[in-house]
Amino acid sequence: MDRDLLLGLSDEELSARCRLEFCRGTGNGGQKRNKTSTAARAVLLEDERFAASDCSERSQHRNRANALWKLRRLIAFEVRCAPPVPPPRITCGVTHAEYPRNLAHMLDVLDSCSYDHKAAAALCGVTPSAFLKLLRRDDALWEKVNSSREALGLHKLKCN
C-alpha cells in the first residue's frame, strides 16, 4: 500500500479503491435520516482493516465525503513509513485537503525519534513549542502521541 498516494487521491479516486456501503442512519434527525440510506461506510479494498463510516449529516453525499476523510485520517494514524528527507514543513490547517498527508509525515518523524518532540521539532526545522502547537491543534493526534509516548515509558506531553 502506497500510503502517500492514497492520502493524496481525490474523493472520486479514493472511492474507486473502496467498497462504499450505504445504509439508514440512526439517532435523531427525523424522517430524512431514519428512512433513507444516508449513512456511509468506506472500506479500503487493498486492506479491509481500514474502514470508516459517518452518519452525522442528512445528506448521503456529505456523509460519503466525511467517511472518506475519516478513512484518510485512519490511514495517516496507522501506517508508518520512513520520514521524508527533508521532512516537509507543516503549514496547512486541519481541514485542508493535504492535512492527512502532513499528519502522517509528522507521525513518521515522531516515530523515527521515539516520540521525542524536541528531536522531531529539530528535524522539522521548528521550535519545540511550535511543534507542540501543531500537535495540540488536533485532539486525536494529541491523544495518539501521548498514548504512544506512554507505551514507550515516556511522560505525557502537557498542553500550555
Give each language-model segment a name.
Residues 1-107, 111-113, 124, 136-139, ...:
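Ribosome-associated translation termination/rescue signal centered on the conserved GGQ peptidyl-tRNA hydrolysis loop
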Residues 131-132:
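Helix-turn-helix DNA-binding helix
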Residues 143-145:
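Short, Lys/Arg-enriched C-terminal cap helix and immediately downstream tail that follows
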Residues 115-116, 120:
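Short helix-boundary/capping micro-motifs
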